[in-house]
Amino acid sequence: MTVNRIALVVAPVVLMVLTVIGMSGIEQCLSTFGKTDAARLALGRIGIAFPYVTAAAIAVIFLFASAGSAIIKLAGWGALAGSAATMLIATMREASRLAAFAAQVPAGKSIASYLDHATLIGATAALMSGCFSLRVALIGNAAFARAEPRRIRGKRALHGEADWMNMQDAARLFSDAGGVVIGERYRVDKDSTAARSFRADDPETWGAGGKSPLLCFDGSFGSSHGIVFAGSGGFKTTSVTIPTALKWGGALVVLDPSNEVAPMVYEHRKAAARFIRILDPKEPETGFNALDWIGRFGGTKEEDIASVASWIMSDSGGMRGVRDDFFRASALQLLTALIADVCLSGHTDKENQTLRQVRANLAEPEPKLRERLQSIYDNSNSDFVKENVAAYVNMTPETFSGVYANAVKETHWLSYPNYAALVSGSTFSTDALAAGETDVFINIDLKTLETHAGLARVIIGSFLNAIYNRDGEVKGRALFFLDEVARLGYMRILETARDAGRKYGIMLTMIYQSIGQMRETYGGRDAASKWFESASWISFAAINDPETADYISRRCGMTTVEIDQVSRSFQTKGSSRTRSKQLAARPLIQPHEVLRMRADEQIVFTAGNAPLRCGRAIWFRREDMKACGGEPVSQGRKDV
């Protein structure tokens, strides 16, 4: 590779210099072909300019021959050096010629009038090739015209004139002052490395990535929520989560199944006077009481208890069988009654009013649990508890067994001491998040999230409701950044935050792998469309799903292109050829082009604006983010 680099720089310089020197005196040979004095003079003039024009042509040919190379910028610098050497030789030759008779120039006449026009023409050709070489050296392969249809705008745009948002409009819409990092302000498809696939371990494929200004969202328009769609291995964490965690200045809640974000941003956010809390089943010493917010700041205890029970029970946005729905609803009511008994009956100490205690009360043999329910009905101080328990006091054993099995199954993760400690601890309270000085990183790995989604739902739901119940009386805004959010299943509180979160200081940014994941979670096409209508911005990157690619293509719109059509006809008398131009409709970007986009490129949609095609802010390409991000910290240093 080093030899190739040296060759690309040295070869054009050597070829151009040898051409200029080797073709010296060619004007004498050319002039012999003339039959008259005027012809011989003209050929002699051409011969003087010919070496320089030939050298310029060599530079251009060399650049076009190198087009598509990953290191074409080196060829550009080499051709530029060769052009400079050619102009220097022309200047020295002309200067020595003029110096020979400079003393004989008549008074009042400039020596510039004696400049050789043929030499000037040759030097100008070298200058033009040098300018093109400089362009190639600066922008690489983007200096060459792309083979694409000519787009028509204005009155002739019969089929539409959809176009990409320009970078100036993007800078106004997503200013650098925002806290949620969207991407980088440059067109990847017009970069010098656009023809090559992005490789994280090969800086030569990065192009302008990492050096361009950031595009950031400040929550100033729309609902303030964002959705990111990126396929598996699509740099979701490195391009969205980590950059935002480094730049966001308010309260932050991150669901991070990769467990990579907190170690990277820990020191940076700590230096910004943030209190960092990391909820990790591997380190259960850090936890909070998921019931400590119940009944506070305007919400009734009964409503809040029902909300907690709904997070524990898995739900679906789609249709369910009647039998399944009955047992689930009954189990939900039983769980609500047991949580209410712990919080409202008055026989449980304040420090024991936790989900761990709820599970302990539930995880009893059926006969003993039925006795407990009878005792709760007889002795509880809360009418709400009695009314919810009443249905189970005289329930038939067969039906109660089905209800009991559902309730035990949905709460079995509370039997794990490390899981229960996360939502039954006392390290911090939900008030700390609402105060705006605390960040929470939920480090639940993908396997745990898949099998015990209720754990993450309870944590996220508690934080959301703790802020929601304050009716906007929070410091700044709290950003909930949820990776692999499809694993949580259906959560009604997320829909509430989607529709009314802006008023209460809640911002959501959710990451899915495809549109199909969202539709599966929320029950079909119509339910998922509500999220598209409510989101301030939607990003698509590293798409591998044809359905998602088709959606992107349709949403970008149609454009009008001009097509050259050539028809040939052959007859006995000869052949004829007819050439015509016609207008045709073409998507701004076709589905197969979406699937072939580089991994560091994305398309961002916002309401009322043209689609934005830009780069992604992959943190390890940016020196400013590498200076802020650190190496993973030790497991013992989790809380500050």
Curated annotation (Swiss-Prot):
It is found in: Cell membrane. InterPro entries: P-loop_NTPase (IPR027417), T4SS-coupling_protein (IPR051539), Ti-typ_conjug_TS_TraG-like (IPR014135), TraG/VirD4 (IPR003688). Keywords: Cell membrane, Conjugation, Membrane, Plasmid, Transmembrane, Transmembrane helix. It comes from the Bacteria. The keyword Aminoacyl-tRNA synthetase does not apply. It is a multi-pass membrane protein. The keyword Transmembrane helix applies. Its main location: membrane. GO terms for cellular component: plasma membrane. The chain crosses the membrane at residues 6-26, 46-66, 70-90, 120-140, 215-235. Belongs to the VirD4/TraG family. This is Probable conjugal transfer protein TraG. The lineage of its organism: Bacteria, Pseudomonadati, Pseudomonadota, Alphaproteobacteria, Hyphomicrobiales. The gene is traG.
